[in-house]
Amino acid sequence: MMLELLPITSPYAVGVRVSGKVNQDDMETVAKAMEAKLKKEDQLGMYIELDHFEGFTLRGFLREARFVFRFMNHITRTAMVGDSRWFNRAAAVIARFFPNVEIEHFTPLQRDEALIWVAEKDAEVY
């Protein structure tokens, strides 16, 4: 698995660590985590740690498209933690599919700040 769910205690955010190429099973794992938190909250933040993002497999990309349509109105913020070169690549993908989502980059040293920012309940919804 190239995507690992992270234990985010906030009810307002889902966290993942991405390393390598994301596949269909990875996207299904994230979708299930999102659905579980959306039972109690209507809007969520996404916390993403990028280790070595290489994109998606074809099936992963198709699953990503379904993920986008299912959750596009529920994600308000995305905090991306990692090297800036991975941020630019991943942010372009997210911005293309989630145009109304606030996206911020944080360095690994700013991990705690990223967790606080992404889990703020009063994130502005467009």
Residue ranges with predicted function:
Residues M2-Y126:
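Amphipathic, Lys/Arg-enriched alpha-helical "gate/interface" segment within cytosolic domains
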